[in-house]
């Protein structure tokens, strides 16, 4: 067994029910934005119970300023239906250079997504700590892309799986098509 109770295989994880954290002390607002920025609230914390309550309410967090968190609910929301996805022949060829794994390098993916040299970077150490806690409880997951035959992490993403939804939070790539 590993952190969060997910049994590991050589290529990733098999599903083990996540651990429900204590409930949040915060009341989540309705999903209607207060202005054109898609922000519905500012404040609260990044405790696991708060994050899960927010996701269940259709909200996600981003830093607002140095100390506060803003809660967003964009309308319309980007949704990628996965049934019927077409992967081109050239992309399939390109993907042969890589190995894809799940939940084997969550912290490394978070750190790569949080790299301050990335344009538009917004992930700070509080978010890394908060989502690492969610990962340890079995709610947050990562997809890692390694160069075939090596241990170099060249791409990945992380997000939260909850109630049949995977909410991708951030991703990075250091190589084409990774």
Please name every model-derived segment:
Residues 1-178:
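N-acyltransferase acceptor-side catalytic subdomain
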């Amino acid at each position: 067994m590993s952190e969060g109770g997910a049994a590991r295989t050589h290529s990733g994880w098999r599903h083990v029910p996540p651990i429900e954290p204590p409930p949040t002390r915060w009341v989540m607002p309705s999903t209607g934005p207060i202005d054109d920025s898609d922000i519905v609230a500012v404040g609260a914390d990044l405790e696991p119970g708060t994050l899960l309550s927010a996701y269940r309410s259709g909200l996600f967090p981003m830093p607002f300023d140095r100390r506060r968190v803003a809660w967003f609910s964009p309308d319309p929301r980007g949704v990628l239906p996965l049934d019927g996805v077409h992967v081109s022949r050239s992309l399939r060829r390109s993907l042969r250079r890589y190995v894809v794994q799940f939940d084997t390098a969550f912290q490394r993916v978070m750190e790569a997504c949080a790299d301050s040299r990335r344009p538009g970077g917004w992930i700070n150490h509080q978010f890394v700590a908060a989502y690492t806690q969610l990962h340890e409880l079995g709610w947050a997951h990562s997809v890692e892309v390694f160069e075939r035959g090596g241990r170099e992490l060249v791409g990945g993403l992380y997000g939260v799986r909850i109630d049949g939804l995977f909410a991708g939070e951030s991703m990075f790539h250091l190589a084409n098509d990774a």
